[in-house]
């Protein structure tokens, strides 16, 4: 097949079999590609050439995974739910070969059923680097009485938070905080979110979808304060979440316009990275990069990344279906 033809002899020699999940996995190969693309809102409007990544040494590297979305169920279309455990295991083994400061999973760690978290633990606990999670809509597709336990199951004491490394402030948002699925069905917050969704649909917004959500007003104020503090401290900022902000389409967070306006006002803010839209995407607007990573779940091929952070750019080294690219900072 074309997929197998793309492997080098060295890759064939390292074929390994995951007997637990009953299939042979071919290690994803990667090369660092530095892509300049024009003409599409889904493509990069400001992609650096390869030389830019060499202007300064990497400050640190970290792992990136989006939409593992595991469940012990049969495939449906292009979604291979059960196979995601083996894909995650493959990603963990690859990430463990590198000196990573941390790793991030950008939401939808599971597809459904609270037991799915337990079934992934033997895989994810092998990861050597510290793992941070952003919450996704499918993470709450569990029994109603267990919804409140999801954040702690993912090791979160707060559903949105900040951490610091090498002169950068990393902000992880909770774009599920206001949504129709986060809380039990008769909860006042759920009823309020349902009303908000109806209003967005009446206004013709493409992102008026039940699988989306937004940050709360309180979280928005927290984000604003974090950006102000980073500016005062001379820090650069990378922001992460599950739902896209741009380009504006059916997968975006409900308050994507307000978030874009806020982030673009702060020169310290360099990029927003997210999952949710499994086919990926990129847009550059008003000095900000908005990068959607490919979902691990889709197709039999894997998708994950190494991110190499430089002072002047972020180099994404993609594996499997994930494209490699370098985005230059303003």
Residue ranges and their predicted role:
Residues 60, 101, 160, 168, ...:
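Alpha/beta-hydrolase fold active-site loops
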Residues 50-118, 218:
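N-terminal active-site segment of His-dependent metallophosphoesterases
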Residues 1-30:
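N-terminal secretory signal peptides
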Residues 54, 114-233, 258-268, 282-318, ...:
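Extended active-site neighborhood of metal-dependent phosphoesterases/phosphodiesterases
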Residues 68-71, 109-112, 137-141, 176-179, ...:
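Solvent-exposed loop/turn segments at secondary-structure junctions
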